[in-house]
Amino acid sequence: MQTYYTKWYSPSVGREMEIKVYGHAGRPVLFIPCQDGRFFDFENYRMTDAWAPWIESGQCMVFSIDTLDKETYSATYDPHDRIRRHEAWMNYIVREVAPFIQSMTNERNGWDGTPGIIAFGCSLGATHAANLYFRFPETFDGLLALSGIYTSEYGFPGYMDELVYANSPVDYLAGISPDHPFIRLYN
């Protein structure tokens, strides 16, 4: 299985962030590790074995990233500051990681344009994956979310503000209008 490791300084989060890519071609999949996870968890937890048939046959490329959960969902300091930090991580994914994924996917497959990305995660990674899919369906057009908690109550119990709401799929999907343009993208 072909792998590729890279890191760069992220202006969104203000530090270096690491990514590991598995595969040589195919549909892009963004893997978000379980709570407090790191980019190497996809490999360390032997997900590479489970995904090998699709990765090695060029059906998909998996991009595994770091989380900031230890500074956000798992931390205990002021919830407003924690959710602002989480939103910086979301911006890192949408503004930095997604374009990187789309560029590499195009290069490896000989494609043009902006290919949709499948968001994939387990546990809190599933929560983040679902949030990416529902908030940014123009970028994330597929979702595999296993055993997540899709409300912000888990990381921010008893606290709600605009950013917490924007990161709580149960809450914002309940408030979405049936004629919202995202509804068409979800289906």
Question: What are the residue ranges of the model-derived segments?
Answer:
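Non-catalytic cap/lid and distal C-terminal segments of serine-dependent acyl enzymes
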Residues: 1-187
